[in-house]
């Protein structure tokens, strides 16, 4: 509309996330090819979230498919303030700056507390990662826990398990977009290769984690490869939890246990990473 009719519109297309790239992938590619602008909202997203409808409707890979379209910018936010920041930035980029891009944003229908936005996190939300919680513990054993979407709630819950039962301090990071972090990492790698005489550029995720102590663990409601694409850019030990395999029909709690992405498996994985480093 903005090109053919000089009438900019702000389309929002809301659907079950499995019915997006899984069902209309050619149209999503055509949207990129034709330089469409707007927002795709993948609702009830994640393999353990649309929990009663089995493998047909449980989406564990839409963000992986979104990553194949160069001008599709994808996010997996957890909190309302993250969603607001992302949409505000998208409106500015598409309709004020005139950038030819469209957005894929996954959302849930799960009831949980939405905290106030921490001060100064807007840039991190847009670029793909920010620190949600920093442990006040002085414990020498420390881990970095990362997550997105609905599974970030399990990541937050794992903090108490590690602290109370094992004396391990845990910082929490919200990873709003692994895809955008990877694109940034690849862009830095290419720039460094093509400009050996200039100061090295650090990927954003490398920069924010370079002073963080201990191994990193990331859990999402998507296949492990979604998180694993960040491995080259994360300093130190990096462990990934995800929902590989077909979906199943059961409660969300049982599905998160089955796919090993709940708070207990996050804690176990963190302890295993500390063990591998000789910290415990």
Residue ranges and their predicted role:
Residues 1-3, 24-31, 87-90, 270:
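Buried hydrophobic packing segments
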Residues 30-47:
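A glycine-rich helix N-cap at a beta->alpha junction
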Residues 1-8, 30-35, 67-69, 230-233:
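Alpha-helix C-terminal capping segments
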Residues 48-61, 67, 74, 82-86, ...:
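Thiamine diphosphate
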Residues 11, 38-39, 170, 238:
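Hydrophobic anchor at the start of a short beta-strand
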Residues 10-15, 23-27, 31, 62, ...:
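Extended, hydrophobic alpha-helical segments in both membrane/secreted and soluble proteins
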Residues 6-19, 39-42, 147:
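A short, small-residue-rich loop immediately preceding and capping a beta-strand
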